[in-house]
Amino acid sequence: NELPSPFKALQIGNVWRADRPQRGRYRQFMQCDIDILGEPSNLAEIELILATTTTLGKLGFQDFVIRINERRILKAMAAYSGFAEEDYDTVFIILDKMDKIGADGVKAELVESGFAAEAADKYMALFDELTANGNSVAWLAEKLGDFLEPEVSQNLSEIIDSVRATKASEFEIAFD
């Protein structure tokens, strides 16, 4: 009773929220899940992104943004900015609010949580600079220097380059 490796699963179905729905969020909704287990290389990441972009393209969506992230890059950015390793979880919880409260709100909440204003400013400035530099992994790797393991930036570059080379519809890739 062993699963093949890699194991791939696709399911589409109704799901329900356990929590109380908020404005614009429904208790029941349809969701698509694609899972790949047991693939240690970047191929799983590439395949998942391509499945998503191909599907969106066939549904007629164009000019959308695929947002990818890598926790080790966020950690390197936090270390570069002066946050202590034991504070990363708190910093990332606040950072996750970026879409709701904006960069200024994130910066303010970091400071309100007791973090140095200089660290908060430096951290948020990195995101602005990254956007200004076209979400370039090479730029970020150079900027972060020894704070970022070379393997991390190489893997992310491989994923982005592979997806861009085979893209099935018009879309942008952004580090988020």
For the regions a language model picked out, list residue spans one by one.
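Short, conserved secondary-structure transition motifs
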Residues: 68-81, 96-102
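Short C-terminal domain-edge/linker segments immediately following a structured domain
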Residues: 40-44, 64-67, 96-99
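Acidic, His- and aromatic-enriched active-site or binding-groove loops in soluble protein domains
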Residues: 83-111
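N-terminal entry module detector
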Residues: 53, 65-66, 78, 82-87
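Positively charged, Gly/Ser-enriched RNA/tRNA-binding surfaces
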Residues: 1-62, 107-176
